[in-house]
Design a protein with these regions (language model features):
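Short acidic/polar hinge/loop motifs at secondary-structure boundaries
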Residues: 109-138
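Gram-negative outer-membrane beta-barrel transporters
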Residues: 403-410, 418-419, 537-538, 542-562, ...
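Outer-membrane beta-barrel signature, preferentially recognizing the C-terminal barrel domain
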Residues: 135, 277-296, 329-337, 385-393, ...
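Transmembrane beta-barrel wall of Gram-negative outer-membrane proteins
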Residues: 180-209, 219-268, 279, 283-297, ...
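Outer-membrane beta-barrel translocator/receptor signature
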Residues: 127-131, 136, 141-218, 239-243
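C-terminal beta-signal and adjacent terminal beta-strands/loops
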Residues: 215, 483-484, 559-561, 657-661, ...
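Flexible loop and strand-edge segments within Gram-negative outer membrane beta-barrel domains
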Residues: 238-242, 255-300, 308-337, 375, ...
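N-terminal periplasmic "start-of-domain" segments of outer-membrane beta-barrel proteins
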Residues: 37-71, 89-91, 97
């Protein structure tokens, strides 16, 4: 019997045991004081209630999207590394990927891939998202550690229960969508059955898309791989296909809630136009048990979860598959992630609250590349990229919240965390080309005889203050000291034998080759941040936020020349470079501005209001005085929206400045500025909703500022793709979606 399914049976038995001890009755419906305070003190992040993100208002975006990270695009300070069609990486104030703590239904998920093709947000379908909370770099220590850029919490829809006088509930909804560019199509369903004390939910979603087209040709027409021809507009390796299933069970008593969520994901294909490989299979199984109890003195919250991923990469149709007699380059990763969180909060007085908690995470990963063909390049043995990789986290934290007066609030927190890492012995495809793994002088041998165990003792501190003299004006400010340890790939990728193997370890999308560094130290970030918030909806219908920030990072992990850390890497003639990693110094600063204003309201024209936001961030390596990689240039978004009867109509204008402050060591590409126009409309009716519109209405050609280097076709394994082409954005695309409730 499958190991995970044995675990599921055990958990179901635990649920049955809890059920027998529950006192069934109506659960208290009011939010806890802790939840109310947290939403108040979050700096430039909140329990999102903006259109297209939370609850019913997110329906329009979720109904046409396949990429959950895209739900965050309108959050101030947020940008996206565009990668595969399902796997964008969020970046908050210039810090992305593992520098952010990303939780899905409370689970701290980890990307099990040398190219980070399966980031945490790819494990939940947009149609299953109930709410999102974004907390920036001065987030409370209880929101998660081992990160320096902030926390993103994505939760599926909350468990539904019937009222005592309502009887049983059976309801749900189903949806379909189509996008003209890439012929993207998909369907989803969500069904609920509930009594006053029991809740059951099932959700499923499927999505499929072909390669998308840019607004104009950015390369030559022709043969991209054997049997595959791409046009000059076609972005190779941008197709995808996915399937997601989720089951939820919940029982509640008068002061208790127990939830069990099971998840299954299968992605048979996801192309990556900025990677040399493509995802040819990703299967994930998740089990998540959550318990919460309200007591006289406060609340207890406990969670235990397990997630396992089987991930495969190779070349899809647009990339060359045969190299001599070698059929592709199969790469596999197996990740096993187990975690537990225990948290309790005590109401000490009407003024003070104390939150104490502990967190445990145990992660195991193997990354290997099976032999291909009979030549010396990829045979006859299995290439061991990371063997028995271990990354264990154990943390304790405490927070003290004080409502000093009706106008002043503070939250102080400290977190102590130990991160222990290790890995086993490695080996190349053969000893002649890659070195004898038992020798003390070969590349794998030096790694195998090194001390590979890492023990990091990390400290996080946060201090947040809020001044709100009235309901229309508030000032939030704070300081945070946050720490992140390197991930397994940053420390334990060892191979610098040739360009081919270095190309395969790249989680940046820049086309370069990378080798890790056993000597990496944790990153330490100090952040100062503030938000000025003014609103007056009664008199003038206006809201305004201004939020500056500054972050200094000690031991920032950045790309360096191999020679600077004592490694010898092959030179290249294709414009890309082979690099390693080292601790540097960096700083990031910027400002977010957002506003909303009601312009007019009448019976004939409905409500018309304007929204807008401007985001600026600058990131710099202060040792080299060059730009940090993938920093979003100055950008703004403005929209004019009309709401009349059941119709909502939106005209949106997005403007992005040119990107020229780039990472020189990586030969990061500059991009030009651009402006896009989007037109959207939706119609709500009692049993559902219809959305339709046009993205990139004027069919403007542009390069994605955070899209990386174009590697979507051809002989990508070695040096067959020249440097210098950026990944273009999507050309004009019409869409339509429908959601029906039952």
């Amino acid at each position: 019997m499958n190991t995970l399914y044995r675990k599921k049976l055990i958990v179901l038995a635990i649920v049955a045991t809890f059920t027998s001890q529950f006192s069934f009755g109506k659960v208290q419906q009011s939010a806890s004081k802790k939840d109310q305070i947290l939403s108040q003190i979050t700096i430039r992040g909140e329990k999102i209630a903006a259109p297209n993100v939370d609850g019913e208002s997110k329906a329009g975006a979720a109904s046409i999207l396949s990429d959950t990270a895209s739900l965050l695009e309108n959050i101030p300070g947020m940008s996206l590394y565009k990668a595969g069609g399902l796997s964008s990486l969020p970046s908050l104030h210039g810090l992305a990927d593992d520098r952010l703590r990303i939780q899905v239904d409370g689970m701290n998920l980890i990307s099990a891939c040398a190219n980070h093709m399966n980031p945490p947000l790819s494990y939940i379908d947009p149609s299953n998202v109930g709410n999102v909370q974004v907390l920036n770099g001065i987030a409370p220590v209880s929101s998660g550690g081992d990160s320096i850029g902030g926390t993103i919490k994505v939760n599926s829809s909350a468990s539904v229960f019937a009222n005592e006088d309502q009887g049983n509930i059976l309801k749900g909804q189903a949806g379909v969508f189509f996008r003209s560019n890439s012929h993207a199509r998909g369907a989803n369903v969500n069904a609920n059955y509930a009594t006053p004390s029991f809740s059951f939910n099932y959700s499923a979603a499927v999505a499929k898309a072909d390669n998308y087209l840019a607004a104009k040709s950015f390369k030559l027409n022709g043969l991209s791989a054997l049997g595959s021809v791409t046009s000059g507009r076609e972005v190779g390796s941008s197709a995808y296909q996915s399937e997601n299933h989720a089951l939820g069970f919940a029982i509640r008593g008068s002061d208790q809630l127990l939830e069990l969520k099971l998840g299954l994901q299968d992605i048979p294909l996801q192309g990556f136009p900025n990677q040399r490989m493509d995802m040819t299979r990703n299967r994930s199984e998740q089990i998540n048990l959550h318990y919460r109890q309200q007591l006289e003195w406060g609340n207890v919250d406990a969670r235990i979860y397990h997630e396992q991923t089987q991930h495969r990469m190779n070349f899809s149709d647009d990339k060359q598959y045969w190299y001599g007699n070698a059929p592709g380059m199969p790469m596999e990763t197996a990740g096993h992630n187990t975690g537990a969180v225990l948290k309790a909060d005590w109401v000490l007085s009407e003024r003070d609250k104390l939150i104490l908690g502990s967190e445990l995470q145990r992660y195991r990963m193997n990354d290997w590349w099976n032999a291909s063909g009979t030549g010396m390049m990829m045979a006859p043995n299995t290439f061991i990229n990371i063997k028995d990789g271990e990354r264990n986290r154990l943390a304790i934290f405490a927070e003290w919240e004080t409502q000093w007066s009706p106008t002043w609030f503070s939250q102080l927190g400290v977190r102590s965390e130990r991160v222990r890492m290790d890995s086993g012995a490695v080996a190349g495809y053969n000893n002649m080309a890659y070195g004898d793994p038992t020798s003390t002088t070969s590349i794998p041998g030096i790694f195998n005889h090194s001390d590979r165990q890492g023990n990091d003792h990390n400290i996080d501190v946060s201090a947040v203050f809020r001044f709100a003299p009235d309901s229309n004006f508030s000032v939030d400010g704070g300081y945070a000291y946050k720490t992140r340890s390197p991930n397994l790939y940053e420390r334990y990728t060892w191979a610098n034998s040739n360009t081919m193997v270095m190309n395969m370890n790249n989680w940046f999308g820049d086309g370069n080759g990378y080798v890790g560094n056993l000597q990496l130290k944790p990153e330490i970030a100090q952040t100062l941040s503030a938000t000025i918030h003014w609103q007056n909806f009664v008199d003038s219908g206006i809201e305004f936020k201004l939020a500056p920030f500054y972050t200094r990072v000690r031991d920032y992990i950045d790309a360096v020349a191999c020679s600077s850390i004592g490694k010898i890497c092959a030179a290249r003639k294709d414009g890309f470079v082979n690099l390693s990693l080292s601790n540097q110094q960096a700083e990031l600063f910027g400002i977010d501005l957002s506003f909303e204003k009601t312009l007019a309201q009448s019976r004939d024209f409905g409500k018309i209001h304007a929204k807008g936001g401007i985001n600026y961030v600058r990131g710099e390596n202060t040792q080299t005085r060059t730009g940090l990689y993938n920093i979003m240039p100055l950008n703004a978004k403005f929209s004019l929206q009309q709401q009349i009867d059941r119709w909502t109509n939106t005209l949106e204008w997005q403007v992005v400045n040119a990107k020229s402050h780039v990472s020189e060591i990586r030969r990061e590409l500059n991009t030009s500025g651009y402006a896009l126009v989007n037109l959207r409309a939706s119609y709500d009716f009692q049993q559902g909703r219809i959305d339709f519109g046009v993205e990139n209405l004027t069919n403007r050609f542009y390069s994605l500022p955070l899209g990386g280097a174009y590697l979507g076709q051809g002989a990508t394994m070695g040096m067959g793709v020249p440097h210098g082409t950026t990944v273009p954005g999507v050309g004009r695309s019409m869409y339509v979606s429908g959601t029906w409730k039952f």
